[in-house]
Amino acid sequence: MYVVSTKQMLNNAQRGGYAVPAFNIHNLETMQVVVETAASMHAPVIIAGTPGTFTHAGTENLMALVSAMAKQYHHPLAIHLDHHTKFDDIAQKVRSGVRSVMIDASHLPFAQNISRVKEVVDFCHRFDVSVEAELGQLGGQEDDVQVNEADALYTNPVQAREFAEATGIDSLAVAIGTAHGMYASAPALDFSRLENIRQWVNLPLVLHGASGLSTKDIQQTIKLGICKINVATELKNAFSQALKNYLTEHPEATDPRDYLQSAKFAMRDVVSKVIADCGCEGRA
């Protein structure tokens, strides 16, 4: 069985001192590039999708594609619900075979966040599904959810321990200065806060908003306990820019099988770099 939970992936990463990249996919070509590149580098990867992606492609279609590609390449893959907020939506997708969930209730007050997350954990663990949750809020936009930078909150290390123990989550997404989207200038990550969180919480930690971070910053977060690195915008930008360039240079192009190749090549460069930055090549 090549479609797996993220729990063992992330526990292995925690023990091995590397991170597993989670790539948000948006179409068939994105998935092909992620899986083909990961298989060629023998690297564990997570196929992530926001609610918008699952609505666009269809849950059953995505599950079938991931399963087929995992078998084709004899490569373990996890399909992960990224930034899902509704219990009924999560439950339906779990019953369809999804084995990794992020319940995002980080916009709620602390006690309500715990209550919402624990409800999802109690349900998901009955199906051997791993659960990630977020404490603190990232700025930027994910799907149609916009968080102003002024409203973004960093993760409190002491609260993080209480949150982890009260909910029973399998991994914790932390807010240390990253944001969804690309950065106009290099962000100032709070490494001391991350180190403090690591001292209080013995779970695999997750970094959202990693698109555009430097190799140095990514590798420093891994040293301080990050076991999962989320990348979305960087893939979308590479795809769209390469496609625009190709169609500008070849205005006569009409066959998607031709003009999408340039976009796939551009995404392949992103995926291989992220895998290298995470230190997970050869770990699958």
UniProtKB/Swiss-Prot annotation:
The keyword Zinc applies. It comes from the Bacteria. It catalyses: D-tagatofuranose 1,6-bisphosphate = D-glyceraldehyde 3-phosphate + dihydroxyacetone phosphate. InterPro entries: Aldolase_TIM (IPR013785), Class_II_FBP_aldolase (IPR050246), FBA_II (IPR000771), TagBP_ald_KbaY/GatY (IPR011288), TagBP_aldolase_GatY (IPR023955). It is an enzyme of class 4 (lyase). Pathway: Carbohydrate metabolism; D-tagatose 6-phosphate degradation; D-glyceraldehyde 3-phosphate and glycerone phosphate from D-tagatose 6-phosphate: step 2/2. Its EC number is 4.1.2.40. Its cofactor is Zn(2+). Binds 1 zinc ion per subunit. One of its GO terms (molecular function) is zinc ion binding. One of its GO terms (cellular component) is cytosol. Dihydroxyacetone phosphate binds at residues 181, 209-211, 230-233. One of its GO terms (biological process) is D-tagatose 6-phosphate catabolic process. Zn(2+) binds at residues 83, 180, 208. The active site is at residue 82. The keyword Ion transport does not apply. Keywords: Galactitol metabolism, Lyase, Metal-binding, Zinc. It holds the Pfam family F_bP_aldolase. Catalytic subunit of the tagatose-1,6-bisphosphate aldolase GatYZ, which catalyzes the reversible aldol condensation of dihydroxyacetone phosphate (DHAP or glycerone-phosphate) with glyceraldehyde 3-phosphate (G3P) to produce tagatose 1,6-bisphosphate (TBP). Requires GatZ subunit for full activity and stability. Is involved in the catabolism of galactitol. Belongs to the class II fructose-bisphosphate aldolase family. TagBP aldolase GatY subfamily. HAMAP family: TagBP_aldolase_GatY. Forms a complex with GatZ. This is D-tagatose-1,6-bisphosphate aldolase subunit GatY. The lineage of its organism: Bacteria, Pseudomonadati, Pseudomonadota, Gammaproteobacteria, Enterobacterales. The gene is gatY.
